[in-house]
Amino acid sequence: WFNIGGKSKIFYKADNLKELVNFLKKLDNKEKIFILGAGSNTLISDNFFDGVVIKLGKNFNNISLMGEDIIIAGSSVLDKSLSEFAMTNNLSGFEFLLGIPGTIGGGIRMNAGCFGREFRDILISIQAVDKVGNVITIPSKKIKFEYRKNDLSEDLIFLSASFKGNKSQANVINDEMLRLKKEKEKNQPTRIKTSGSTFKNPVSQTKKKVWELIKESVPLDQKFGDAYISEKHCNFFVNKGNATFDDMIKLIDFVAENVFKKT
């Protein structure tokens, strides 16, 4: 989303589970692997990545309803698509996903959330495959979730997940989604080259939001090359032209150092 990044040794798009498992079994176990979702929360180096980038294809992009209140979604399904599917099936609890521009797999990996809700609030279980091709199912109660993280192994590739909603009415759900959308558009930049919130809120250290700390500590007109701080939300950094990876890292480091100095 920053429109920044270099090349990798191998880029592999898996069309289905069988192909993915076969590919993993052929890889050297020491090979570095990076799973690319929507790329909406990713800053990629301009340097060559000496490893394998894997992206899951269309057969990991299915959504289905099981029973009255359980949804099964592939890991490359967009968060927005899951929220809309839930609304169509009169299930609430997924409205917050409308504000997250990522995939189900990425959302689980970082326990993504907004508007006071997180993935762990709706997750029942995940299906994943490890680096050597073993497919496993993990119940959410076996996962230790924290703010924007969990204890799942970095070696796992998420395939799909099951979620539980609450029966409601589509018009009520739609009204809530419209309210959240308006709130997001009012407070956050959209349709620009950004990767969303850069820093996590320091929930264990202060009640202040990270944007408040940045606003109090950093000259907001600071830039490096074409890497800028958003005028609309100072925890959003923007590529206004041809910013490089180094430009963005310099801006991130500059903001972090100034906040640490003054708090």
For each predicted feature, which ranges?
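Short, well-ordered alpha-helical segments in soluble proteins
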Residues: A86, I104, I108-A112, Q127-D130, ...
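Anion-binding (especially nucleotide phosphate/pyrophosphate-binding) glycine-rich loop
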Residues: W1-I104
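Phosphate/pyrophosphate- and phosphate-bearing ligand-binding catalytic cores of soluble enzymes
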Residues: T42, V129-N258, K262
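Structural signature of FAD isoalloxazine-binding scaffolds in flavoprotein oxidoreductases
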Residues: G5, Y12-L17, L43-N61, R109-S140, ...
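A gly/ser-rich beta-alpha-beta helix-loop segment of oxidoreductase catalytic cores
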Residues: M87-I124, T194, K200
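Short acidic (Asp/Glu) patches
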Residues: V77-K80, M110-A112, K141-E146
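Solvent-exposed alpha-helices and their adjacent loops that cap or buttress functional pockets
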Residues: F2-G5, D28, I35-L36, I44-N47, ...
